[in-house]
């Protein structure tokens, strides 16, 4: 006996939506998925008419679906946005060079301008060279720190009002778990925020796919026949996030709603007033947003350039302490010179 679409459109169902379990035809699934993202955008006032938005594009399923849906909703609901693609080339052979070809295809398909920035031009290093020096351990720390700052640099260069990232519900639930397991209350406070950053010295980031399940995104890309790059990063198997992801998938088998349950729990967490919250400022070296002096990117880069890459690893690394001590010495010298010049 055929199963018909739950929306009562009269068409036969061709899929069962992972997030809700509803049997839907393709068109009704598309409409429900897009309407959900539109509701997320409008209810959280993520954009304003006339803004220029950089879509962080990696060529993967999330950023490809995000670019496609934002273009569609921008035209359908008259958001009045100027959408551009911003990609970061980490310098990972056999992975990023191939995925960037997909990004270029997205640029042509969606008729958006594209800006590509590389670690090589920004930092003088590629991830291939970094991994060759430090090994397979902690490479995601370097890549994550450099990538976040590279997006800020690219956004500033493009003079955009905000950056839209493809973080989905699964990503956010994984991050909540990771921060709980690591006892990282500072990141736990903000990891469920749909908008982060902003202010005088930083460009805000928004997550339009915050409530979209990864399985829904894959299904949408499949039935829409979108072109995306599906190969996992060659360095990803060693990432700590993989353990949180595996744990989450096991929980999901027992309780399908666990992804949204974790996100809602993260949103409702309350912290004691005695828990110190990092103060976001500007790095004294590179001038970009940071909650420490100097910023983590500068600390890691300092270690690489000095041939001591592990200086910057850890919550309060040896590199942090060393550079802070250097800064104190420089400050004392400057003060001594000022006093000397006064006489």
From Swiss-Prot:
One Pfam match, given by its short name, reads: TtuA_LIM_N
Q: Which domain of life is it from?
A: Eukaryota
One Gene Ontology term, aspect cellular component: cytosol
Q: What is its main location?
A: cytoplasm
- Which GO terms of the molecular function aspect are on file? nucleotidyltransferase activity; tRNA binding
Which cysteine pairs are joined by S-S bonds? none
**EC number(s) given by UniProt:** 2.7.7.-
Q: In which pathway does it act?
A: tRNA modification; 5-methoxycarbonylmethyl-2-thiouridine-tRNA biosynthesis
Could you list this entry's UniProt keywords, alphabetically sorted: Cytoplasm, RNA-binding, Transferase, tRNA processing, tRNA-binding
Q: Name one GO biological process term.
A: protein urmylation
Cellular location of this protein?
A: Cytoplasm
Name the SUPFAM superfamilies for this protein: Adenine nucleotide alpha hydrolases-like
For this protein, the record's InterPro entries field holds: CTU1-like_ATP-bd, CTU1_C, Ncs6/Tuc1/Ctu1, Rossmann-like_a/b/a_fold, TilS/TtcA_N, tRNA_thiolation_TtcA_Ctu1, TtuA-like_LIM_N, UPF0021_CS
Function summary: Plays a central role in 2-thiolation of mcm(5)S(2)U at tRNA wobble positions of tRNA(Lys), tRNA(Glu) and tRNA(Gln). Directly binds tRNAs and probably acts by catalyzing adenylation of tRNAs, an intermediate required for 2-thiolation. It is unclear whether it acts as a sulfurtransferase that transfers sulfur from thiocarboxylated URM1 onto the uridine of tRNAs at wobble position.
NCBIfam families under this entry?
Answer: TIGR00269 family protein (TIGR00269)
Q: Which family does it belong to?
A: Belongs to the TtcA family. CTU1/NCS6/ATPBD3 subfamily.
> This protein is called what?
Cytoplasmic tRNA 2-thiolation protein 1
């Amino acid at each position: 006996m055929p199963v018909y679409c739950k929306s009562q459109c009269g068409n036969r169902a061709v899929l069962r939506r992972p997030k809700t379990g509803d049997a839907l035809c393709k068109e009704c699934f598309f409409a429900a998925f897009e309407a959900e993202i539109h509701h997320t955008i409008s209810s959280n006032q993520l954009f304003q008419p006339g803004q220029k938005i950089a879509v962080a594009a990696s060529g993967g399923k999330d950023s490809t679906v995000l670019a496609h849906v934002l273009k569609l909703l921008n035209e359908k609901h008259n958001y009045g946005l100027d959408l551009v693609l911003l990609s970061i080339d980490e310098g990972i052979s056999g992975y990023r060079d191939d995925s960037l070809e997909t990004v270029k295809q997205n640029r042509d398909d969606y008729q958006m301008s594209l800006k590509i920035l590389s670690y090589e031009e920004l930092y003088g290093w590629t991830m291939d060279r970094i991994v060759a020096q430090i090994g397979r351990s902690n490479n995601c720390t370097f890549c994550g720190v450099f990538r976040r700052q590279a997006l800020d640099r690219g956004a500033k260069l493009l003079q955009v009002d905000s950056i839209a990232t493809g973080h989905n519900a699964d990503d956010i639930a994984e991050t909540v778990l990771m921060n709980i397991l690591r006892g990282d209350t500072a990141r736990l406070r903000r990891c469920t925020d749909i908008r982060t950053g902003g202010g005088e010295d930083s460009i805000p980031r928004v997550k339009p796919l915050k409530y979209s399940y990864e399985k829904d995104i894959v299904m949408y890309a499949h039935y829409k026949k979108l072109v995306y790059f599906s190969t996992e990063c060659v360095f990803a198997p060693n990432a700590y996030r993989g353990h949180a992801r595996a744990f989450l998938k096991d929980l999901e088998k027992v309780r399908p709603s666990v992804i949204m349950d974790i996100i809602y729990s993260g949103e409702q967490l309350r912290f004691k007033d005695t828990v110190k919250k990092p103060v976001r400022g500007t790095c004294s070296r590179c001038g970009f947003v940071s909650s420490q002096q100097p910023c983590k990117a500068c600390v890691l880069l300092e270690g690489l350039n000095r041939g001591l890459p592990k200086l910057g690893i850890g919550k309060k690394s040896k590199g942090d302490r060393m550079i802070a001590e250097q800064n104190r010495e420089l400050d004392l010298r400057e003060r001594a010179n000022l006093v000397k010049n006064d006489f």
